[in-house]
Amino acid sequence: MRSGRRLFPLLLLALLPLALLPGLCHGREPAPGAVTCGSVLKLLNTRHSVRLHSHEVKYGSGSGQQSVTGVEASDDANSYWRIRGKSDSSCQRGTPVKCGQAIRLTHVNTGKNLHTHHFPSPLSNNQEVSAFGDDGEGDDLDFWIVQCSGTYWEREDAVRFKHVGTEVFLSITGEQYGHPIRGQREVHGMPAANHHNYWKAMEGVFIKPSLDPAKHDEL
């Protein structure tokens, strides 16, 4: 009997590291703060405190495509983006987005994808970032790699988005537009990783993370 009492604390110590493994006691699911496929959110540039934004205003130069800007207002409905994979099958609704995964960001109100290409941006002469496509379908220049430090993209983390096709980072350096979008900031691509290209998930509708896409709900 005494032998059994001595073994019980040892057994607890042996099991403790297993209990601390993320998701082990929850069907191996990631932490509830993981950003998931299908979620709709706003993205804040942490350096300049503006949210990624688009609208039915086209660039007057460069590609002439729909412009992408940064806005200070937190309640602007044109700042919502849907998280999607390179294909819908590669990023099923409720699946947590992994660090290093390629995604698409689809503008909710216009159905166009975050996009960049070899046109100069109008204010800083960096690489133009636009919104492109119809009903969520564009081309191979709509893909962005989520750069973060853990296993999954967590909502509280500052992350970078690196463009697959041209290897620039989604950035803001503070240049402001005049009429008709006065005060909005230029969004562009920069070749170097720096403090201008950190983004954080903010307001939105987040699908509860699950490694089983059949099991999900909204937070």
Descriptions of predicted regions:
Residues R2-L219:
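Lectin-like carbohydrate-binding module/patch detector with strong preference for beta-trefoil
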